[in-house]
């Protein structure tokens, strides 16, 4: 109805001119800032942008056909110098390497599906034609299926008879060792022989006076 009453196709508003010419756009305070949420620079597409790295708009090249996977996680630091697209576009998402290699058998989720309750219980009558997802769980291997560890396969090493004899003699000498006789005990408090320090009746400074 509005086209019949008054057509505005031939009218160009000041707002449209300001947007096309990017009027009022202030340069960045310093280069290298994150411009992920900014619009695309129209002058850069025409190779006419003279602001360079100070331009507040994104400089996107035409060959960027794949979305940057690091930008999706907020980890890309290249900015406009990145060779991938910094724009959320489902048609240009990077292809999963595992999906390209294994196809539908890829274990990574590509479509949102509901897990089959019957399959989780233990049996699904629909089988492979079930419309719900049948996840594949990696079960741990049993002890009989696991390969033997390297230290278990090595034969036990035999010690030399000389070493065994030395160890036995050391153990026997350590086991037969008893308390020292009092004649060989010297008290560190008084310096006399014949008793231990805990049995000494003199003071701990008696060795200084020679008493």
UniProtKB/Swiss-Prot annotation:
GO MF term (any one) = zinc ion binding
Question: Does the record bear Zinc in its keywords?
Answer: yes
Q: Where are the zinc fingers (CCHC-type)?
A: 185-202
Q: Which GO terms describe its biological process?
A: mRNA processing
GO cellular component terms given for this protein: mRNA cleavage and polyadenylation specificity factor complex
* Alphabetical UniProt keywords: Metal-binding, mRNA processing, Nucleus, Phosphoprotein, Repeat, RNA-binding, Zinc, Zinc-finger
**At which residues is Phosphoserine found?**
209
Q: Can you say where in the cell this protein is located? A: Nucleus
Q: Map the zinc fingers (C3H1-type) to residue ranges.
A: 35-61, 62-89, 111-137
Entry-linked InterPro entries: CPSF4/Yth1 (IPR045348), Znf_CCCH (IPR000571), Znf_CCCH_sf (IPR036855), Znf_CCHC (IPR001878), Znf_CCHC_sf (IPR036875)
- List the transmembrane segments: none
Subunit structure, interactors included: Component of the cleavage and polyadenylation specificity factor (CPSF) complex, composed of CPSF1, CPSF2, CPSF3, CPSF4 and FIP1L1. Interacts with FIP1L1.
Q: Which PANTHER family match?
A: CLEAVAGE AND POLYADENYLATION SPECIFICITY FACTOR SUBUNIT 4 (PTHR23102:SF18), CLEAVAGE AND POLYADENYLATION SPECIFICITY FACTOR SUBUNIT 4-RELATED (PTHR23102)
What is its biological role?
Answer: Component of the cleavage and polyadenylation specificity factor (CPSF) complex that play a key role in pre-mRNA 3'-end formation, recognizing the AAUAAA signal sequence and interacting with poly(A) polymerase and other factors to bring about cleavage and poly(A) addition. CPSF4 binds RNA polymers with a preference for poly(U).
Q: Which family does it belong to?
A: Belongs to the CPSF4/YTH1 family.
Protein known as: Cleavage and polyadenylation specificity factor subunit 4
Q: What species is given as this protein's source? A: Mus musculus
Give me the gene this protein comes from: Cpsf4
């Amino acid at each position: 109805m509005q086209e019949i009453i008054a057509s505005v196709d031939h009218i160009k508003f000041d707002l449209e001119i300001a947007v096309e010419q990017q009027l009022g756009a202030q340069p960045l305070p310093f280069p290298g800032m994150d411009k992920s949420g900014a619009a695309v620079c129209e002058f850069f597409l025409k190779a006419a942008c003279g602001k360079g790295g100070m331009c507040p708009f994104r400089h996107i090249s035409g060959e960027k056909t794949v979305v940057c996977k690091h930008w999706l996680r907020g980890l890309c630091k290249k900015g406009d110098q990145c060779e991938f697209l910094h724009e959320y576009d489902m048609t240009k998402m990077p292809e999963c390497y595992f999906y390209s290699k294994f196809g539908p058998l890829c274990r990574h989720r590509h479509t949102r599906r509901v897990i089959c309750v019957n399959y989780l219980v233990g049996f699904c009558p629909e089988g492979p034609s079930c419309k719900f997802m049948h996840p594949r769980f990696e079960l741990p291997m049993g002890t009989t299926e696991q390969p033997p560890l390297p230290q278990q396969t090595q034969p036990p090493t035999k010690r030399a008879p000389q070493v065994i004899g030395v160890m036995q003699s050391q153990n026997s000498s350590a086991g037969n060792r008893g308390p020292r006789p009092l004649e060989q005990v010297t008290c560190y408090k008084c310096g006399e022989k014949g008793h231990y320090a805990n049995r000494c009746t003199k003071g701990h400074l008696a060795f200084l006076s020679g008493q």
